Amino acid sequence: MEKISNVYCIEGLMADSNSYLIDNSNDGSDYKYILVDTGTGQSDAFLFSQIREIGIEPEDIDLIVNTHCHFDHVGGNDFFPNAKIAIHKKDAVALRDPDSELTVSSLFGSIVRKHDVDIEFEEGDKIANFEVISTPGHTSGGLSLYDGEILICGDTIFANGGVGRMDIGGNPNDMKSSLMCLKDLDVKYLLPGHGPWVKNGNEHIKMSCMMMGIKY
């Protein structure tokens, strides 16, 4: 497990998303430990072991931020009993009233339990040292978190120019708009929803833009 600034990077197993634990314990905030995405919930023992390696327990997680509503990112939400749930307002309906067409849980042979959503994020909201950026395209309510150097981008962009698929609740035009927004950021570290996290984030954003036919 690698730590970048105050973010611990936890690699997802098999179909699980990556998870990112933001250590906000020195900020004096109500949210000391923030977990970004929880995977499918099918590898909970591994995720717990990684969290305990940091020196905290699952019960210590105060807030879960889901980058979007797909099962491989929200399926483990139930394992953190004291955590509030935050997601973009456009994807909140999928957690409050789960629909397999929105969560794509049927692709994993599972279901998503109904969740309370405590925080509905919008563009420009703040959490810890990060700003919320709306990045639809993979879903209508995709979001990214940016702190001036680190971009936690869910399934919007992957290393080496990949982008999230747009045929399961997404939209290519939304994806292009999101990439147009992200290409203007100064990104030293790109932390995607799957696959490796990488340095020189702008180079990977550039490759994604080129793949989508966007001039960089």
Language-model regions: role of each:
Residues N6-E11, G41, D62-I64, I111, ...:
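Short, flexible loop segments at the rims of nucleotide/cofactor-binding pockets, characterized by
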Residues G28-S29, I54-E59, D125-A128, L185:
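Glycine-rich phosphate-binding loop signature in dinucleotide/nucleotide-binding domains
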Residues G39-E122, M210:
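Active-site HxH/HxHxD metal-binding segment of metal-dependent hydrolases
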Residues E2-I4, F80-N82, I127, D184-L185:
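Short, well-ordered coil/turn elements that cap or connect secondary structure elements
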Residues T40-Q42, E131-S134, T139-I214:
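Metallo-beta-lactamase
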Residues I111-S144:
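Internal catalytic-core helix/loop-beta-alpha segment
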Residues I34-V36, V65, I85, I152, ...:
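Residue-level marker for buried hydrophobic side chains located in beta-strands
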Residues M1-E53, S144-A159:
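Conserved beta-strand hairpin/beta-sheet module of binuclear metal-dependent hydrolase folds
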